[in-house]
């Protein structure tokens, strides 16, 4: 082990700008300073009682929450991988995802696959860090607005975001599932959220349960790990808008832990995991204290903004908590 990641607009459009050189990227954290799970949990708990925007440096800056990231792996010069991270209506995935879409330790024979929508993309910095530290290859195949499970409740040709439709997501999803299965990973981590556009039909609990069960069954339950869904806010812009108006009363902006645990998707995740004997990775404590889920967390004397927007965690917070992910026991 060496010494010590409207619906996807912000995350994916900023990614494109970063590749074009329009954004400055944040430096990679020092491997020797990556916090443990216990350290992150203590920091989150300590942040819960703070009501003011922290003084000093904040990463990502409030003026550039989509700031791109630099991998802890010095051999990974560009974390953006065409076809592996799709932000438009394209559906073509690289032929050899084990090479083209590799993060973490690309030379390892142990493989973890990360699949899903823009929320899966937000987890890439965390899984990249975790994989590099633990000598595991992480293969990421993600598509904006395309959940890793089927969504028969959505109209096939109605735009979800931009020109992305469920019909196009279905084409991408079939290709993703086939290529990931052929890769024979030790673990598959599917990440997604239900529709955030209220004009789109929301699934019933039964529909969501059926969809997640089918996905877990396809990948083989014993090889699936579901990350606990992270806190979400009402609108994509709601986090920053609230912080702007409540710089000394951040508790007015925070999500309560009870709201996250009672979230329909979170409950269905647990029900499906229990019935199919899949794993649920306890990540909620990396975001929420006993009562609330803070917007800012301080680690190694650096203030981190936890969220890029109302639906996505920031690249920088995802990266700094990467080594704290409790995944090791699930990867053979």
What are these regions (language model features)?
Residues 2-332:
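Extracellular/periplasmic envelope-modification machinery, especially enzymes
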